[in-house]
Regions:
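Flexible, surface-exposed loop/linker segments and immediately adjacent secondary-structure boundaries
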Residues: 14, 22-161, 166-177, 182-202, ...
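Flexible, low-complexity linkers/stalks enriched in Thr/Pro that connect modular domains
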Residues: 181, 190, 276-288
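Extracellular fibronectin type III
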Residues: 184-185, 266-280
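Conserved aromatic anchor
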Residues: 208-220, 301-313
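Surface-exposed, short loops/turns at beta-strand junctions within beta-sandwich domains
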Residues: 249-258, 343-351
């Protein structure tokens, strides 16, 4: 501490000491919200469906499936929102000084996560996300990390983040992003591109389709759209990626939602996001029981449905969901005819469900 006299400490002097001198104890994280297929691995290596509200310990891993999400809260009130098809290992969860200082280190095995770190602004907090290609050390509060195929992307939404590899490091300031490939040094930070602009988005739907459009951008190579029940997308309903600025939100149940969208450039760097709240209010009546689809019909894409003709003024809505509760729609057809062929759907480890509505 460079004291002029080691035997005298003046009133008001600030001293630095190693964390190893402080009492340390294991901390726990908490799954505060889950939506869809969220799995947690116990310390013996077995996987099971996660439950909202359960504690997560050092050494445990969480993975999130298609059209699913999870929110994790840590000892210093930091929050991590896991996006679809992401996987995170709790590498270190510790607290010092009676819980005032936290040391949180996470391993992002793959996928996209969004972080709001140290929201209380306490000094001495440590929050790191380790990817296969780099380490993101937080010196700010809000940032995004995405790890795919040996490449990591990082964007700082508020504060600053140090992105480091064995080959070098960069300091990514607020409003900038960087990328790094395995075994290389991070690229110089680039300004995050502006969010896409909606074209007169509807705030309430009383009929199909639930369509949204954005202003076309020639330099954009892709569009990502998400629908969730909250603005953070911790209660995600669906995600869609396309090469055009158009999105049909599908056969959503009645209720309030948020639509979030961003663009991707030719290097895969995401833009800022745009958020739009909307409501669905389309009266409908379930026709018969919900049908559990046999896996071989789904994988072959050869299932045909014959429907009874309806009286004038009534229409069919046919819908397929990933879950039995109808919260995760993957396909729908409004104003369906009396003969309908279902498309081929991606394989999953539990049955799809078919819903037939009259509206």
């Amino acid at each position: 501490n460079r004291l002029p006299n080691n035997g005298v400490i003046q009133v008001g002097a600030q001293l630095r000491m190693p964390l190893s001198w402080l009492a340390v104890k294991q901390a726990q994280a908490k799954l505060t919200a889950i939506s869809g297929d969220v799995q947690i691995q116990d310390l013996k290596g077995a996987w099971r469906q996660a439950q909202a509200g359960e504690a997560v310990q050092t050494g445990q891993q969480i993975k999130v499936g298609i059209n699913s999400s999870a929110r994790v809260q840590f000892a210093d009130a930091s929050e991590l929102v896991m996006q679809p098809q992401s996987s995170v290992l709790m590498d270190t969860l510790s607290v010092y000084a009676g819980g005032y200082m936290a040391d949180t280190q996470l391993r992002l095995q793959g996928g996209r996560v969004e972080v709001h770190a140290n929201p209380q602004g306490r000094q001495g907090q440590k929050f790191e996300i380790i990817t296969p290609a780099a380490v993101a050390s937080v010196r700010g509060t809000q940032f995004v990390v995405d790890a795919q195929n040996g490449r990591s992307l990082q964007q700082t939404l508020e504060g600053q983040v140090a992105l480091q590899t064995t080959q070098g490091h960069v300091l990514v300031q607020e409003g900038f992003g960087s990328a790094v490939k395995l075994g290389e040094k991070p690229i110089a930070p680039e300004v995050i591109k502006p969010a896409p602009v909606f074209q007169s988005p509807a705030s309430r739907f009383v009929d199909f389709p639930m369509a949204f459009k954005w202003v076309a951008q020639t330099e954009v190579k892709g569009w990502v759209m998400q629908v969730g029940r909250d603005a953070q997308m911790a209660q995600l309903v669906l995600t869609h990626q396309a090469d055009s600025p158009f999105f049909d939100a599908g056969g959503l149940a009645d209720g309030r939602y948020y639509l979030r969208a961003w663009t991707l450039d030719d290097k895969g760097m995401p833009s800022k996001t745009v958020l739009h709240p909307f409501e669905v209010d389309i009266p409908r009546k379930l026709q018969g029981a919900v049908i559990q689809l046999a896996p071989h019909y789904v994988s072959m894409g050869s299932m045909t449905i014959d429907l009874v003709p309806l009286p004038p003024g009534q229409r069919y809505l046919v819908q397929v969901t990933r879950d039995a509760e109808g919260r995760q729609p993957v396909w729908y057809q409004a104003n369906a005819g009396v003969v309908l062929s279902l498309p081929q759907l991606p394989a999953q480890d539990h049955p799809y469900h078919l819903w037939i509505w009259i509206y």
